[in-house]
């Protein structure tokens, strides 16, 4: 059963498209009504709707999962509004904390860093991490963990102009409401995932990716708009699934943002070819996509052409290409990803101050491949260990802004 995190970062990139990545992958279900979506939710709870071709073990897992999510009843309209309001109140508190960090608050900065580390670990593990693992991942001593959390929460309450008790109550209500909304809509995730079976991912993998989309929908849903949550969540669920399919469908995996641009170019090529009866030029594509010809060319150049390892080479065509390639070292896929990542890292780090850039390069081994400890960096730059940690935290906060963070996250997911 897919693990679901209820502690993910609230600051998602609001400019991500709700459209499917590839018209060849997408299903034309854009006209589904609210009633039809709710019917899908109910139908998804019936194990009989799954084909008999799946192996028994997989079918049993699916049946157990459906039975578990079927125990959670669907939310009524008023319940959706009430739960969503609690989630939004909590997320507004998170924005208050994030703004304080942006302004350089020395107490709020390490506190927010710890919270983000905990949420990331919870997402990866499927449960909250131990204090030891939490502290180690955050790069601090275990004895410093509780003081930072205690002081940080007091500072957060002070900034939000409320008591610590009021803050904790609102935080608890927000997280519980978020979890409730996710669990109550998992049947919708299954119903959407079923439409994308036999495309390279198992059903439960599709459900897991769709659940991540559902989580984003919960955080972004505005109950004052007047529409049902299932209508809004459907698009986020679908996007999560289609992005996963697009990522896994390539022999050489490209960053998702490159895949999205490539799919837009393909769609524009088909449209222009149909309208003008000829192969579109770079200029045609640039006009259609509101890009420059250079930008279109750069996207196309990042897409490698596949060559079969069984291709016959040599004068007598008696040798296969695969026999001439070394098996050790960096693979072509890794080389492509690292070169592309290096180019974008240079642009990313250009926004930092020179000292912040030096700390990040040394801390993560981006310059020479050797990561340095805070103490080692402090000795090299003639700074205290605590000052290095503060500089690192401030630099990472800049790099975590959605427009930058999501770009690098795509690369890291592909490299891993």
From Swiss-Prot:
InterPro entries: RNA_pol_sigma-70_dom (IPR014284), RNA_pol_sigma70 (IPR000943), RNA_pol_sigma70_r1_2 (IPR009042), RNA_pol_sigma70_r2 (IPR007627), RNA_pol_sigma70_r3 (IPR007624), RNA_pol_sigma70_r4 (IPR007630), RNA_pol_sigma_r2 (IPR013325), RNA_pol_sigma_r3/r4-like (IPR013324). NCBIfam families: PRK07598.1, Sig70-cyanoRpoD, sigma70-ECF. Residues 374-393 bind DNA. One of its GO terms (molecular function) is sigma factor activity. GO terms for biological process: DNA-templated transcription initiation. The keyword Isomerase does not apply. Gene3D superfamilies: RNA Polymerase Primary Sigma Factor, Winged helix-like DNA-binding domain superfamily/Winged helix DNA-binding domain. A motif (Polymerase core binding) lies at residues 205-218. It comes from the Bacteria. It comes from Nostoc sp. (strain PCC 7120 / SAG 25.82 / UTEX 2576). Keywords: DNA-binding, Sigma factor, Transcription, Transcription regulation. Sigma factors are initiation factors that promote the attachment of RNA polymerase to specific initiation sites and are then released. Belongs to the sigma-70 factor family. The keyword Disulfide bond does not apply. This is RNA polymerase sigma-C factor. CDD domains: Sigma70_r4. Pfam families: Sigma70_r1_2, Sigma70_r2, Sigma70_r3, Sigma70_r4.
């Amino acid at each position: 059963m897919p693990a679901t995190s209820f502690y993910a970062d609230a600051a998602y990139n609001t400019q991500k498209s709700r459209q499917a990545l590839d018209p060849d992958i997408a299903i034309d279900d854009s006209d589904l009504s609210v009633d039809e979506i709710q019917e899908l939710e109910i139908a998804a709870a019936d194990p009989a709707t799954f084909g008999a071709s799946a192996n028994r073990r997989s079918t049993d897992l699916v049946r157990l999962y459906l039975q578990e999510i079927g125990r959670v009843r669907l939310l009524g309209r008023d319940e959706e509004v009430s739960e969503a309001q609690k989630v939004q109140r909590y997320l507004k508190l998170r924005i208050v904390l994030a703004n304080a960090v942006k302004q350089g608050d020395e107490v709020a900065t390490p506190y927010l860093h710890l919270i983000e580390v905990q949420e990331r670990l919870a997402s990866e593990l499927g449960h909250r991490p131990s204090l030891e693992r939490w502290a180690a991942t955050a790069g601090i001593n275990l004895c410093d963990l509780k003081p930072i959390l205690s002081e940080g929460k007091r500072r957060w309450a002070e900034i939000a102009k409320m008591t610590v008790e009021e803050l904790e109550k609102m935080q608890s209500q927000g997280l519980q409401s978020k979890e409730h909304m996710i669990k109550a809509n998992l049947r919708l995730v299954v119903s959407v995932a079923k439409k994308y079976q036999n495309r390279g991912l198992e059903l439960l993998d599709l459900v897991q990716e769709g659940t991540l989309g559902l989580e984003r929908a919960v955080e972004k849903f505005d109950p004052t708009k007047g529409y049902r949550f299932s209508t809004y969540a459907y698009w986020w669920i679908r996007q999560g699934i289609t992005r996963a399919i697009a990522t896994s469908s390539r022999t050489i995996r490209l960053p998702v943002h490159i895949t999205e641009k490539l799919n837009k170019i393909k769609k524009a090529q088909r449209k222009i070819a149909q309208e003008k009866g000829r192969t579109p030029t770079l200029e045609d594509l640039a006009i259609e996509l509101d890009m420059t010809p250079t930008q279109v060319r750069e996207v196309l150049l990042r897409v490698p052409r596949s060559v079969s390892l069984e291709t016959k080479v040599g004068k007598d065509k008696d040798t296969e290409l695969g026999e001439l390639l070394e098996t050790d070292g960096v693979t072509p896929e890794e080389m492509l990803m690292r070169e592309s990542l290096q180019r974008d890292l240079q642009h990313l780090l250009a926004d930092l101050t020179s000292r912040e850039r030096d700390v990040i390069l040394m801390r993560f081994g981006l310059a020479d491949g050797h990561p340095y400890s805070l103490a080692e960096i402090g000795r090299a730059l003639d700074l205290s260990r605590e000052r290095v940690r503060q500089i690192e935290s401030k630099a990472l906060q800049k790099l975590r802004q959605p427009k930058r963070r999501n770009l690098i996250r795509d690369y890291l997911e592909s490299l891993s």
